[in-house]
Amino acid sequence: MKYEWDDTKKWSNFEKHGVDFCDAVFFNWQHALIIEDARNDYAEDRFNAFAPINNRLYVMTYTLRDDVIRVISLRKANKREVNYYVSNFQNLNAN
C-alpha cells in the first residue's frame, strides 16, 4: 500500500498523540475494522480504521486518493475503542 500525508499534520499528530504517520506502514489491514467517518460533511469520504500495529490497537483516520491512503490521524485506541473493536471484529468473523 502507498501512503501519503501532510507533513505539518504529521508533526502535529506526533505532538498530540505521540505517534508518527510513518508507522502507518505497519498497520495490519488484514485485521482492520473500517467504518465511514460521517460526523461532518467532509469534501471527500473519510474512514476510521481500527487495527493492530505490533500487538497494540491503533485508530487511523484516512481518505483514499486513487490508489493512495492519505493519513489524516493515527493514534493508539482508547479503552472504549478497544472494546468496540473486539466486539465488532469478533462478530464479523463469526458470520
List PLM regions with ranges.
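Ribonuclease/tRNase effector modules and their secretory precursors
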Residues: 1-95
